């Protein structure tokens, strides 16, 4: 029997969880997520980025130990009134490459999120999409991929065999929710293979050269986000606030603007 306890009010700035990430260099960082900002960001993301409504069925395919699991298996869908599918297993050989499609059909999934690696593995086992045709995917509206580069070939293959829109988008543990995404719940932007779409409302994304000068289109540089950061982004590192502050750079572009290098 479950014991029912009185709910306890929390301040919006109270810590919700701490998640360690190694990043690409340096020692691991304890990302601190706050209650209020996380709730605001994820409710916005579920509705406006992923196009989900209360009563919809969402499937975030990840491990709860990663930020995708926290944001898009637990907090985001449940706060938005969605059913969330929790799945443990490989995309192939359980027993075959139709495992994902079987779950979509069985639970009437409306949208799913996974890493490109999973779809590349499915493609390798079922290049012509023969197994996918054995399942009813009429409930599925969108597929979202992130976590690594989604190559154009896999993007185009997945759209062809599934008959559904495929969207690449980008974010990371420090932000807790998407930085660039299609925003299908708003007007959205057409899926473009090789693109992770435009900046989500609230993020002011810039690309700078090594000297901190603003770059235009079709140039490679460092991606930065102008302050203030939107709700949901980490505001400190556990036990190492000085290190967090060191990552906040004062860079002058057309006018003095504080930027967060990511």
Label each residue range with its predicted role.
Residues 82, 110-114, 123-190, 204, ...:
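Gly/Ser/Thr-rich phosphate-binding loop
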Residues 39-57, 67-111, 124-126, 130:
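Conserved AMP-binding/adenylation subdomain of ANL enzymes
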Residues 198-202, 213-248:
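Conserved ATP/PPi-binding loop(s) of AMP-dependent carboxylate-activating enzymes
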Residues 16-40:
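Conserved AMP-binding A3 loop
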Residues 1-8, 12-14, 251-262:
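Single conserved hydrophobic/aromatic residue that forms the stacking wall/gate
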